[in-house]
Amino acid sequence: MVFSEEQKAAIYYKDGPALVLAGPGSGKTTVIINRIERLIRMHNIEPSSILVITFTKAAAISMKQRFLSLVGDSYVSVTFGTFHAVFFNMLRQAYNYSAGSIITADTQYSFIRDAAISFELE
């Protein structure tokens, strides 16, 4: 694949986290997976220290599949996930939380409703 100068800059950047913003179909996923591959192979970055966060579960799964098809199964320790999944895993590991420990949407709504009613009465 031929990359633009902007894409090359993102792929070759190695000094810390990178935020890749671009429109649909612009090659973001390809750039990200090529950057990860380069970090591991050229800069000896430990795969388990790489975290890739996306907005949707489908995007995370797709990106991981595309990454593994590029590099093979030798780098399965790279973490791909959504914001929610990544932060839930942090809570689970740090505090032994389970899915039942997380407040439900109904409870959230009730709490906010009760707080709003209380605020209006005072």
Language model features with spans:
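P-loop NTPase Walker
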Residues: M1-S98
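ATP-hydrolysis module of ASCE/P-loop NTPase motor domains
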Residues: K14, Y75-S77, N96-E122
